């Protein structure tokens, strides 16, 4: 009997991927990993989030993260999910200071990253979560704002459309709920447990991700006979 090997997805990103702010269940990515573990032939998920990472640092570790997680000899993961960009939106020193990575450099770097990642495996990209401007600055030096977050998420979408990469916008979906501020940690930047649950529920039902995973959409009728 041949061994059925489930597909492997690596998720590259920042503290959101790490699950910071969710002591209950370890974040949206960990929730997805556990959810898939409970499914027959569910994909294997590697959450690879590093606190503080922006686009450039994620790009710098792309090759190494992919190359060592094939599990079997000469194998690679079958998918890459990028969840990055929020840290790049922060303005340094004051509310109108320079961004950590200016929009033009962000877009160019993202285009390069998508091209490199597509040479390794199918790629998907996740949008950005909201921030609470009223409690800024973060760590007394970084100013996050909704206008900046909205601008950078639009750049994510632009690059994904150009590269024909599936993209799941998050910002407006989360902001549409009147309770969205209650989904943030006191620092105004990181999602709390409920915020991570909200993102998990959206990612879990993402049609592009379900197609990649060869999983039947939730609520869809069974095709078995």
How would you label these PLM feature ranges?
Residues 1-51, 56-57, 63-75, 80:
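Serine-esterase "nucleophile elbow" of acetyl-processing enzymes
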Residues 59-225:
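Alpha-helical cap/lid subdomain in secreted, periplasmic
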